[in-house]
């Protein structure tokens, strides 16, 4: 999926022997766990923390060199066995073959004409690696006792993958042998390659991903060495950081949600063969047939014999593609950047604005998005900005006015402005805010384009620079679009143009008719971000912006990254760190050198 590099392939069996002390590794992983469990540093300190964590990880990797297990041969040597295994177990394998598409890596190539919407690929449940199959495997005993595994299906799948890879008789070995040995996610970037992402929005999630992965590895290293329920896992003698990085990357780039067998809920799964398909723009064409209990995929478009068969991964931004899938997608029609906005509690009209927003189903503080295509904002962001810029009289009209309900319904519709003055204010604000965000970058669009043309860069460095270039291009488009809208509504106000009238309430009017094909997008709910200082209009216009896009100091981070599952691993890690502090020597004594 996406461009995949491969230096060597992973194999079940024993790795090379290295003279490394288990006690020394436990001490290093305990130190890593403690470091990764510290609170998120303030603005400008994240890079320093990243370097410190990376230094510890590299120490561990150096000690573990030669311990990882490998398969013989190349990845594509195992493709015939994958097809044979899939065929024998009820998957469709006719009409396509696995082929190498150079920059995009391996993918599926049509061997006959395939019509749009034709069912061409299906994979039965028994071929899938799922959280349920993990619970029924050798991992089940530890799963039943570990809160992290129970709460985080992606980590469960990663360990399921590692355990099955270490079993030469695993049912899934024909699939596992064909997985890449390395990925192009930022977990595999060199330090100088990550440097290119500094000052971008994406860097915060890159730091978070690296820190979380290191914390999880350190936590589970101790669990595997000391927990009674982990004694039967085939990982005790060889569980390296590189192994864990490979497993979480395999899951991160491939996991999908499918329904459980009874259809009552969803679970995470790895889908062999289907996950060979690369991405293009389009619509989701994969579903799950509960009656036949299989994953099914219909063709996104007509494919001629010899053409690559693409699928659509979803409406992901390029930041999401780079961080979670390891590739940058040119001409991504769903690309976007985040913009954190909130109504300040010190605003004298806060209570009224909060009530209007609540009636519209919009939080008073959230992460919204600026899009790469016109219009740059969703209906939800338009509604928020209108309320954000309302005066007292306009707020009263939306709360107790004669047509209050109608006005709430049309908040997100571009055809029905609140007033010309309100429209001028909101576009002026958006123009200023996007301009502020542009100032946080150390290079310009022209600088990045020139750098890409004149330097011989690694694939990772190219990806990083394209990502920061893309962020700036979206912000520049937003500035131009907002300026054009501001000028238009200023003229409407100067000309005394009448406001458009509406007749009756219609919930459909909440959608922005200019972008009726796009649902409002909120990238993160209020509960998912830390408590933040919100902005008044005048504060946003005049605020200084720091390197990583902070406005008004450390309490105005617009790209907070914290999820419930991350909090859980951190909570568990803190507990383990305390254990490590209190009984480090006792714990290491349990592992004989």
From Swiss-Prot:
Pfam families: Rubis-subs-bind, SET. GO terms for cellular component: cytoplasm. Residues 553-562 have a biased composition (Polar residues). Its EC number is 2.1.1.85. S-adenosyl-L-methionine binds at residues 75, 104-106, 254, 275-279, 325-327. It is found in: Cytoplasm. GO terms for biological process: actin modification; peptidyl-histidine methylation; positive regulation of DNA-templated transcription. Residues 94-314 form the SET domain. It catalyses: L-histidyl-[protein] + S-adenosyl-L-methionine = N(tele)-methyl-L-histidyl-[protein] + S-adenosyl-L-homocysteine + H(+). One of its GO terms (molecular function) is actin binding. The keyword Methyltransferase applies. PANTHER family: ACTIN-HISTIDINE N-METHYLTRANSFERASE, UNCHARACTERIZED PUTATIVE METHYLTRANSFERASE. Protein-histidine N-methyltransferase that specifically mediates 3-methylhistidine (tele-methylhistidine) methylation of actin at 'His-73'. Does not have protein-lysine N-methyltransferase activity and probably only catalyzes histidine methylation of actin. Belongs to the class V-like SAM-binding methyltransferase superfamily. SETD3 actin-histidine methyltransferase family. The SET domain specifically recognizes and binds actin, suggesting that it does not accommodate substrates diverging from actin. This is Actin-histidine N-methyltransferase. The lineage of its organism: Eukaryota, Metazoa, Chordata, Craniata, Vertebrata.
